[in-house]
Amino acid sequence: MKTFALFPAVLMLAFGNVSAQETVDPASPEPTTTRMETLVVSGNQPGPGLWRVSRDDHDLWILGTVSPLPKRMQWESGKVERLVARSQELLAQPSVTVSAKVGFFARLALIPTALRARNNPDGKPLQEQVSAALYQRWLVQKKRYLGRSRSIEKRRPIMAATKLYEEALDDNKLSERTRIWSVLRKSAKRNKVTMTVPMVTIEIADPKAALKEFATTTLEDEACFETTLTRLETDMENMKARANAWAVGDVQALLDLPHPDQRGVCADALLATAVAEKRGMSDLRAQLRARWLEAADEALLKNESTVAVMAIESLLGDDGILAALRERGYTVQAPE
């Protein structure tokens, strides 16, 4: 049985977080005063402390993560690695695998269809896919981060927004390609600690047909497009501040700063399609959340010590992971 990422955009957008996302308010007119630009930290940084979830003598230590993080930061991971080495299990964020009986050459044959799926199915340019006001906002951000790119104008709004967001992060010395999980995974492997990845598997009988169906499906993705633009227009300095706060271990700043995220809105645009619904993907985020909580329950029952990784925006809030763990009767202590 081979695994094949049928909807790479879904996996990227939906599963960085498993709880409901905070919405981003529509952009306000830019102030006439100049705001000082936040400088992004670099070099060796300690990172934050861990949340402690406990019952009796069993502890679950949760490292809250932030995305993006400073691109040129090196995390001083020794303290957490030593905790992993003393623990019985390392619990990852929930993940999804799309399983299909597809061989190597068959997967290669699917690439052209997957590439076509990035573009608007009716061939209309981006300008005709979104409102005039929204397109003007797009042009401002495009000029800033993408320059004169013409190919991007063929993309679906959700794909264009994703590319714009990636380039904006890079230009601001931020990155979503962090090595946090990689470092902890290597530590667990080195110390023979059990690693658990809570997984939801989607079975796809005919990936070629599914991709073709997706390529001809019109998405309701203007909200994703607008939310991404708003994030870049209004949240970039806070984004840097959150990244810096994580790097230097300022937990209070992480708690105080807002955590807007456009990925939930963008994921909804993809998961609401008929092609996703027919294949059991419409409630995927709820499935992933439930699977992680189930794995956490099991770890707390059988292990004296477990280390877990979870996005901070998924941990916090009335409907966050920490609230769910409190409802289950666990004691939750914030990092010092």
Give the location of each predicted region:
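Bacterial N-terminal signal peptides
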Residues: 5-14
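A cross-kingdom marker for long, charged
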Residues: 270-336
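Structured, acidic catalytic/metal-binding patches in enzyme active sites
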Residues: 24-41, 47-280
